[in-house]
Amino acid sequence: MVLVAQIIVDVPLMQTDRPYSYLIPEAMQGQIAIGMRVHVPFGKGNRLLQGFVIGLEEQENLRDFPELKPIAELLDYEPVLNQDQLDLADQMRHTVFSYKISILKSMLPGLLNSQYDKVIMATDKLDEEDKQTFLQGQDHVLFSQLSEEQRQAIPRLVQSGRVTVDYLAKDKQNIKTEKHYSVQKGILETLAISQRAKRRLEMRDFLLKKSEPGKVADLHKLFSRDVVKFFIEAGALVITEVEVNRADSYFEKVEKTDFLELNVQQAHAVEEMTRQIGQGGKPFLLEGVTGSGKTEVYLHLIERTLAMGKTAIVLVPEISLTPQMTNRFISRFGDLVAIMHSGLSDGEKFDEWRKVRSGQAKVVVGARSAIFAPLDNIGAIIIDEEHEATYKQESNPRYHARDVALLRAKSHGAVLVLGSATPSIETRARAQKGVYHFLELTRRANPNAKIPQVEVVDFKDFVGRQEASDFTPPLLEKIRERLARKEQVVLMLNRRGYSSFVMCRDCGYVDDCPNCDISLTLHMDTKTMNCHYCDFQKAIPHVCPNCQSRQIRYYGTGTQKAYDQLTELLPEARVIRMDVDTTRKKGAHEKLLEAFGSGKADILLGTQMIAKGLDFPNVTLVGVLNADTSLNLPDFRSAERTFQLLTQVAGRAGRADKEGEVIIQTYNPSHYAIRFAQQQDYEGFYVYEMGIRRQLAYPPYFYTVGITLSHKDEEFVVRKSYEVMAYLREHLSDKVTFLGPTPKPIARTHNLYHYQIIIKYRFEDNLEETLNRVLDMTQEPENKDLRLIIDHEPQNFT
């Protein structure tokens, strides 16, 4: 009997998107399992590639398979993917138009997809003799430092619990350890210490009172390194390296809180959702005005889920994953929570993933990719701010977290909750049709908190009468009132940097990116012009490169420019600027919010990131500096996005006992998105927008697929775009509507030209098969360097 493994190799191509059979060497039999990673020889040159084991089978006779190659190396000693995740990858392939290997890799922390070594760590079950034989007598050793014979013994030691294995990034330490000490009292009591060595005597007395081991770092706070070293060298202290989770210190900072009492609407929502845990069934849309206590509903639902012995996933948009938000979950559920988002280092992400995989964490709170968390027995999946476009991944594999959540909820019989104050039009339409259950929270959780008054200010009324381009007199007056009352202000501008572009007033020259069809953005803090697409950077021009004129002017606005205007107009105000540039450093986001929350600033000025998830009781004024920036994009969702953003940012005002006010500055005060946002009227906006969508045949009345072709040669990409269009017309029904091929709104980035085709359809049986064939066509030799993206239900058309 011969054991054979089915392996998906790490080559994301049409030709390799299938399992390959490999022989399991005798030394690996009994150690290999589905979900592990291996190194296998691949192709004619037997190049070593990583692969995932997705199946195991027994064959009667190897003579029937003489060409089988053996697996070269086992990379894991326990599976990194479970069967649930492997099944999920198979289901996702049908809608994301991606290769299976890309989907599998997206489920793992980045560290496991990079260069790393393994650390073999002894447990207390490993005796001294085996430690000498297999670990060179050390408590932990790098796998790369072991002999071949020692390496072959490791799987057996792992399975018997005598060693554990962790991963070490080649460029960064993956495992964080700290030194702990234990006191050898017998040695300490007989240790000779001079009466003149006062600090040594003090430390001896201190240690004699210690019954528990402690951290060496704590000793260093009390005594000098030389004094501590004396006791270590004398053998009175035994030092051991203890592995720590990098997030532990953060969890220790958060104080435990009690559950709040729910109002009638909140309690009804929790009861309805709880009934469905373990039953599956239709998802819930929880539509609640800003400040209505949706998060408290989530917390109570999770408490019920855990009481049933099940686990939970909470997805939050990356931009909303503030310490304020994560602390609410940690304060209720402590170290049962794992946090997963892009602000963590590779090592921290790995620690949290391992905490989930080991079963220690029962609640995962994270951004989009947390939907893949390797939890077992899921009882609830919650997607907060479900309308956010960031739940759709814009790189391969292009999945929407909501679609993956639907698959996982169905597989586990879990309740799926979609929460928002401003649900996406598609989600609300499904609730209207009865595809989703519909629950509402119509009033703020704090009975003293009122929905803020919203005033719209027309920029056109103040042309030539403004002290600064970004601030109208009514807004400045309201800000001054708040400063006088010692209240706080939040100001939002949907653009980072200084100005949107630089132009010569003599010849009209605009400084563009050489790689992209987009103007460069001025950044005064770095004194550079930057491209936000390809990261090209150059010095700020003081002379026009075209006509050598010095009449260079900065047009548009940005957070940095608004900050400069604000500090000039209101020198007494303490202003915090918060955008991608000021929050780039690790922990900066948290520090800025902490400073504002503790009253160290009067005004918080920022981009979209300040519109979500912030809850500061002293904020009584919110100002939107220009509501038009997202309104004028060439995208059918631009009105919806503007309405959602304005409603969300308005919700930051008056969340406690003080009344809130909102000022929206715009050149388009009569636009329906702004009018409905002023009235905080989601229902009115929904009905109006649905009428437009029906008229123009856009979602939710039709489904859409975006196809983008890219190449460095524009003539070539145009020709290929028309070939793809002809193929689609030939193989799809006449009920399908096609738009294009046309250049994308930004037609060139990274020196590649982009053309797009939009498909609109209601029901189309051949669509999946046809699109997969189009994907395969681009792999043919004559299409070398042609990039093709197939995006099912694209969230952005810009």
Language model features with spans:
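A general secondary-structure signal for short beta-strands and their flanking turns/coil
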Residues: V2-V4, D17, N46, K486, ...
